[in-house]
């Protein structure tokens, strides 16, 4: 039913059905309205497991060795409905794991293997993911057997790792702990294109102009087009795409070559047929197809006749074993462009020895030409990549080690710090990309530290702003950032414009001294100072409260910090502190919404935090926009009271600023930004603002503010879970 009137024998029998399609949704009627849906994802209404289910505890009960044994057996248990190439599913499973993890992009931390999102649209139906639905169906008996003790997210990531082990690679390790989502993600921007393989994401001729935060060159691809830029072979141009996209997945040149080569050491591409015979993707398939897509109902369409990418062939002589054959073929042969049976561009070797050809996937008496994609040829022809490839070719052990580490990074990049890894195969080594933080001291006199903070000459605004700036970098997407580690005192964070370096230096000097005197970490004292400021402000508003505090944060060092990797965490805007670094094409309220989602806040938590921070005097550079109170420093609900007061009128001024005037006299009372006024203009946010403006909700406002504040301060305290 889609809500349409049904008055014929073939129409919907319900006169006013529920709206089950998007044709007449609110966003269709009002496409420019602020869409708060990204803040209301993945709650108990979509999760069938119930609010008391804790996957991170459940997975600890898993028989890890039995699971791995079953996965090893799966690799060579070929099923007639989807036969394994050469009797081994390793290549398919690796592609599935790679394409789950490879959707990660460092700019906003979204994508990646951490949620099992490959089960849902749009990823389950991307052109680059053709036939990965078959890989997940092959895993279903194992998922069914181990049930709640293994998430789809963990199983999808683990399958590729076990596949490599089964083909002879010594892997670096594996950490469990990825929790499944149960609904397509609404917050991830995959691009603006309205058609598959669209490439309207460049604002210039340079391949570096790829739109942020995207890390793929076309809609529906994981990284680059394997045939070449926009489907036109040109290895040196493709090398530019490879460098940009892998860089945006947090990989350097050596890791890029290792991952490309290691991913193509095993398995094959599939294009031995006509793609026009493929049925619709899983989301568009008929109900009888039961969630499977790209079904060929015209020709055989399986085994040697499978069509996926359209390119046809294996990269190496022995596609079911880990070896150095990729570099042997790539570097020792000349290659020429040809078309696959499906019509895709691919590179094939000139005058190849018969014994260097891989055998047919079904008949070992037949040998086939190996192939290379344009991305593979980029490794050969780009001088930087070529040098790395030659080193790997000469030193297979080094290649295997670099690849194993890069594969581990790829499949764990969005899991956050090592403390979140579960299981017997977690590597002991701390890796700098994990943003390590040492354990902090829990056994110090918290009351004494609070007393010293309260006795300092720091203002409420200084204390609260510093704590907020330290914690606001947290991203729930890849679990990076946050207050733990106190990296706000290190490069690059101490110099970020959004952190007001001059003010920050003054505050840190005082707080570091208090930390030294009390035995607390600086990270703890920064958060504690924010709490002290809030307690003071609440008291000024007539409420005695204690802001919850959990000691034990550690202090990271420069040696533990890859400064360059933190550049992507720099706030370029902060609606909570009413600040924009510069004017952007995106509306300020939308930027705030994106930051809110990354921090893991709900719409009403966002509302109460903005209203509270305004009256505490925390605006960047002490601007007065949105400070709708004459009691700055008191935790009152004045922001909401005055925002909703019809004695006021709101008049545009300049540069997205507004004047709030007395409706009778016309006198200017306050100034505001779009971020301030959206809490009165958006119908949903206004409903929250009205709750907090009520005369009987002054205490509720304070309690809700403290709860939301504490949530942010502890967002990265995975040790408390």
From Swiss-Prot:
Q: Which CDD domains match?
A: catalase_peroxidase_1
Cross-link Tryptophyl-tyrosyl-methioninium (Tyr-Met) (with W-98) position reads: 223-249
Does Iron appear among the keywords? yes
- EC number(s) on file: 1.11.1.21
Report any one BP term from Gene Ontology: cellular response to hydrogen peroxide
Q: How is the cofactor bound?
A: Binds 1 heme b (iron(II)-protoporphyrin IX) group per dimer.
Which residues participate in heme b binding?
264
Q: State the needed cofactors, names only.
A: heme b
List residue numbers at the site (Transition state stabilizer): 95
PROSITE patterns with a match to the protein in the record: PEROXIDASE_2, PEROXIDASE_4
Q: Where is this cross-link: Tryptophyl-tyrosyl-methioninium (Trp-Tyr) (with M-249)?
A: 98-223
Note the InterPro entries from the entry: Catalase_peroxidase, Haem_peroxidase, Haem_peroxidase_sf, Peroxidases_AS
Q: How is it modified after translation?
A: Formation of the three residue Trp-Tyr-Met cross-link is important for the catalase, but not the peroxidase activity of the enzyme.
Gene Ontology molecular function, alphabetical: catalase activity; heme binding; metal ion binding
Cellular component GO terms held in the UniProt record: cytosol
Q: Which UniProt keywords apply?
A: Heme, Hydrogen peroxide, Iron, Metal-binding, Oxidoreductase, Peroxidase
What is its quaternary makeup? Homodimer or homotetramer.
Instruction: Give a short account of what the protein does.
Output: Bifunctional enzyme with both catalase and broad-spectrum peroxidase activity.
Q: Which family does it belong to?
A: Belongs to the peroxidase family. Peroxidase/catalase subfamily.
Annotated protein name in UniProt: Catalase-peroxidase 1
Source organism per entry reads Legionella pneumophila (strain Lens)
Lineage at the top is:
Bacteria, Pseudomonadati, Pseudomonadota, Gammaproteobacteria, Legionellales
